[in-house]
Design a protein with these regions (language model features):
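Active-site oxyanion/phosphate-handling segment shared across diverse enzymes
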Residues: 143-195
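Short aromatic/basic micro-patch
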Residues: 41, 98, 138, 178-179
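Short beta->alpha junction loops
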Residues: 64-70, 173-174
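N-terminal nucleotide-binding beta1-loop-alpha1 segment
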Residues: 1-30
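A short, N-terminal amphipathic alpha-helix
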Residues: 45-64, 78-82
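Short alpha-helical oligomerization interface
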Residues: 33-41
Length: 195
């Protein structure tokens, strides 16, 4: 786990970012990829390195879960078990290389007063009702027992509905831009060049 960066506005009792990097990346390989999607190059750095750089820039504590678990639920449970004293958790799939540090901090700040925080991105010109759920999803310490009991591929959907969850609007297309296929990687490359 990384320590906090004192130059950032870190929320009191900051949650730990759980970077989930356990997946096999089969869709990426099936789409023509020649390496694991997290090792694919995007603007001269790997997809994983972009995600790590954003997390490090946020100043929040973090943990990478890359042990090769069979499902997302198993990965989340393992990561929470390795960070038992965290004030909460931001669950961030490692294949979101365009996520912005400010988004991580925005979710962390909102988590201070809520059990679960669901970031949502609204595309330009769209109404808030058309918001797309994104990442990272924030979970307060109150969710710990349920997160530790997760398994399989469903992730934390069951935990989300068991607690009071709020939606927040984030101004970050990176919160919904994951890399699952070679086409996704090409789209991310175009978006990265436009920054």
């Amino acid at each position: 786990m990384q320590t906090e960066n004192p130059t950032k506005k870190i929320p009191k009792n900051a949650p730990t970012v759980l970077i989930l990097a356990s997946g096999r990346g089969e869709r990426f390989l099936a789409s023509g990829g020649t390496t694991h999607k997290l090792q694919a190059l995007l603007g001269g750095k790997t997809v994983l390195q972009h995600t790590l750089d954003a997390v490090k820039a946020s100043g929040l504590p973090w943990h990478v879960e890359d042990a090769g678990h069979p499902g997302m639920g198993d990965s989340i449970a393992a990561a929470v078990s390795k960070t038992p004293d965290a004030a909460g958790w931001l669950v961030l799939p490692a294949d979101l290389p365009l996520i912005q540090p400010a988004t991580l901090l925005q979710v962390a700040e909102a988590l201070g007063a809520n059990d679960v925080v669901l970031p949502c991105f609204v595309r330009d010109g769209a109404h808030e009702e058309a918001a797309q759920r994104g990442h990272p999803v924030g979970f307060g310490a109150v969710c710990k027992k349920d997160l530790l009991n997760l398994s399989g591929n469903k992730g934390a959907a069951g935990v989300i509905v068991s607690y009071t969850a709020i939606k927040i609007i984030v101004n970050d297309v990176g919160s919904v831009t994951d890399v699952d296929t070679v086409d996704d990687l090409l789209r991310a490359e175009t978006m990265l060049k436009m920054r």
